[in-house]
Amino acid sequence: ISYHLGMDFFRDEDKTLCMAPKKYIDKMLQNYERTFKSKPQFVTSPIEKGDNPELDTSELLDDDQTQNYQSLIGALQWAVSIGRFDIQTAVMSMSSFRAAPRIGHLKRVKRIFGYLAKMNEATIRVRTEIPDYSDLPEPHYDWSRSVYGNVTEDIPLDAPKPLGKVVRFTHFVDANLMHDVLTGKSVTGILHLANQTPIDWYSKKQATVETATYGSEFVAARICVDHAVDLRNTFRYLGVPIEDSNYMFGDNKSVVDSSTTPHAGLNKRHNILSFHRVRQAIASGVIKFYHIPGEENPADILSKHWGYSQIWHVLRPLLFWGGDTADCIDE
């Protein structure tokens, strides 16, 4: 099979299986040209860094323009679903205005098309090598005297016998406080990898309004843990062997320390459910949670409106580099 539901399937020069929505994006750009009688202007980021489209006060679009706007958003949403997670935050933000979009919102959506036209070589490569985390410290805490006791993972009893090579899950998580300045809602951004292959991505406004970064990052960590548990059981039911623990990385050290230390306290009862959900997963050994610098966190791609220079060094090895990603870092 070489094409299915908008995805091209092929192998690159080193025989790595690749998935890329190139034909689908080409068709999107053709429809764009038919609609607006011009090609989109090339840009290197979906939306300008730090932009707040919710503050736009330009004129509302008429009915025909609104229908075009909704059609463009729908096309972009499918592009996200089939691999272009680099535009997901922008599409998520602009989807909020589908009911009553403005001229400024349409200009921003056109910019996303310009980004896709410029950065049209994005490809998900199925890299099956297990990532090496041997340099990470292995914390040794006794959780048995905590409120979680000797908690263990709930493993389904009706899953088939696992066969094949083992899979290691990696999760990158981030939150953007007050992403929407009108509602005060933060955005959760999560990127999931099986071995070295991106398999799922998430960018969505949080249900609650958090007043501090600590709270929004803990909500994001809790959502990531829920996803991790779901992925583990999905792979079990597919008969795929998985490692005992998943690796989760976040850039908020306070949240990481509060989650991984048994004697850590909580001063905000508002965060208590997220706090205990994450800590229980760590106490059971399902999750290993580590801190990384914010500039090295790929989840930034999914949590905020970013600039090219800010993100390229983490986006490039994920979507725009063929071969060994270590060579990409060396460059």
Regions found by a protein language model. Give the residues of each.
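Long, low-complexity, charge-biased intrinsically disordered regions
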Residues: I1-E331
